[in-house]
């Protein structure tokens, strides 16, 4: 089987990362998420800080492969860009980011919220059960958590890596 140069590089990278892990007894589903997180960030401290609900990774994997997750929503376009297109196509999954939507810009301006918050509000209106991926905006993650508490969203899963120094810790605590 010819995996291609890019796939070969990724596999070699994952093997290198796995050799460097301090804990070799990590459950397979969490290890998969951890390898990807370290590969993305080049930060081996992820081994100490990555949080995943028990069975969350395997449950989400089964949902995606079972066709139960037709849509992934991202807070920003860069997060959408980082999701492998070949896998999406193979699984029939669509990725959407509402950040550039005109209605989102209008909503953000009229409500006095960030565009990413407005984007999540709009996304939940159309896709309340999607998988939500946050690669930037803590305010968007907080918005989703509020919508979940209000019963307006029941995500298939949440993958959250908000950045910055404002609202980041609060958003991470809210999602737990």
Question: PLM features: residue spans?
Answer:
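Electropositive, gly/pro-rich neighborhoods at or near active sites that engage anionic ligands
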Residues: 1-71
